[in-house]
Structure formats: structure tokens, C-alpha cells
Amino acid sequence: MNPLITDFQTPQQRTPVIVALDFANEKDTLGFVRNLDPALCQIKIGKELFTATGRSLAESLIHQGFKLFLDLKYHDIPHTVAQACKVAADMGVWMVDMHASGGRRMMEAAAEAVAGYGTKPLLIGVTVLTSMEQSDLAEIGLNTAPEEQVIRLAKLAQSSGLDGVVCSAQEAAPLRRELGRDFVLVTPGIRLDVAGNNDDQRRIMTPAEALAAGSTYLVMGRPVTRAADPVAVLREVNRVANLEAN
């Protein structure tokens, strides 16, 4: 049975998908989300869309009832990251991330900055980008396997007060064993069918595989946003998630 984060979702209503809104502008984004139900998914805004639209779009989506993952991958001095997390909390952001390689002091400052909020955003550490393989790590001076580096950074994130990490589905099972059932695992690189995949997410799995491995949330972009019926895709993944939970 897949571990559940019971503080955030009940087994009967598990909705693990975070839809990556990888659109270039506000018009296309709002046109797409108009047909989504906040009860079926969470949504994510990344660097491109946030840079193009600023906080106004993010706040609009939050006001529509969506749980928003602000995926800006903070990596800066502790004070700067802490202040950014406070701004995100003031906006009502549900989840925000930062590079765990920014170190303990940066992550502890972020956790302390939002500790006083009644409803604080989940703080998530970015470990190893899913586009990176062992050869990529070697090029930046890390002579270790991706899984080893992920576990090292995830342990650091947990001990620094973060709520979870971003990891590929391949790392989910060992992380779940190492860090326990309450640590949030956010998994990108999710595809409905891995056969013939040639995009930039190297370490990929299907929703069922990722959930079985221990992932808490599944980041899905094109498989949802380019689907003929995005709602049908979300309902099917939710169905699989609740079967896995039971």
C-alpha cells in the first residue's frame, strides 16, 4: 500500500496530480484551467509563466480555489530565500520549492520564515533534476550516482525542516524507506506511456508505477495539457491512486 500523507489528503479523496501549466501567457493558461476542477488536481506555475505574468496570475488561480505549487526553485543566500518564502505564504501558495544544494542554513531559514503561519506552504527541496543522468553529475564534479545524491540531499532537507523533496519515481522507494511515510515526495517525469518517450525528462514512470514506488504527488504537464480530454486523464489517475491507496 502506498504511504499517504493523511494531514493533506484522505484516502477516499486522493488527488495526487499536480498539473504543470507550461503555457507562455496568461490567456492560454486561463483558457485551459477554465475546464479544470480544483477538486481533481493541484496546479504548478514555473519560471517561464511566472516571469511572463507575475504574481497576478498566481493569485487569480488561488482565488479560483486551486492549490498552487510555485515552482521557482529558490537558490540564494538564507535571508533572500526566507523572504521569498514569506511572500509566497502571504499569497496563499500551497507549495514552494528550493534547491537543497543551497545548504542547511538556507533551508532552515526558509522553514523558520513560514513557521508562524496558520496555513503555511509546503516547503520542498529540489534534489537532482530529472533531466540529469550520472554523466551530467560527473561534469559538475559529483562523482556519484543520481540516487545516492538524491538520498544525501533529501536527508539534509528533512533534517533542515523541509516537508519533502522533488525526486524521480526511481528514487521514491529508497527515499520512502529512509525518510518515513510522512515525508512528501513530489515526482516529475510522469508519462501515461513511457514507450517512445524522447523529451527532456530522463528518469520517467507511469502514474501507477510512481504511486506504487511511494510518490505522494505526480507532476504531469503535457500528458494532461495536451490531452484531448484533460479531465478524463485526471479522473483516471485519481482512480488508480485510490486503488493503490486501498
Swiss-Prot record:
Q: What is its EC number?
A: 4.1.1.23
The record's keywords, sorted A to Z, are:
Decarboxylase, Lyase, Pyrimidine biosynthesis
Q: What InterPro entries has UniProt attached to this entry?
A: Aldolase_TIM, OMPdecase, OMPdecase_AS, OMPdecase_bac, OMPdeCOase_dom, RibuloseP-bd_barrel
Cite the Pfam families for this sequence: OMPdecase (PF00215)
Q: In which pathway does it act?
A: Pyrimidine metabolism; UMP biosynthesis via de novo pathway; UMP from orotate: step 2/2
Q: Which SMART domains does the record associate with it? A: OMPdecase (SM00934)
| Signal sequence range | none
Q: Where does substrate bind?
A: 22, 44, 71-80, 130, 191, 201, 221-222
Molecular function GO labels: orotidine-5'-phosphate decarboxylase activity
Q: Where is the active site?
A: K73 (proton donor)
Its GO CC terms are: cytosol
Listed under catalytic activity are: orotidine 5'-phosphate + H(+) = UMP + CO2
**Gene Ontology process terms (BP):** 'de novo' pyrimidine nucleobase biosynthetic process; 'de novo' UMP biosynthetic process
The family annotation for this protein states: Belongs to the OMP decarboxylase family. Type 1 subfamily.
Described by its record, this protein's role is as follows: Catalyzes the decarboxylation of orotidine 5'-monophosphate (OMP) to uridine 5'-monophosphate (UMP).
* Xref: NCBIfam families: PRK00230.1, pyrF
Self-association or partners: how does it assemble? Answer: Homodimer.
Name of the protein in its database record: Orotidine 5'-phosphate decarboxylase
- Supply the source organism for this entry: Neisseria gonorrhoeae (strain ATCC 700825 / FA 1090)
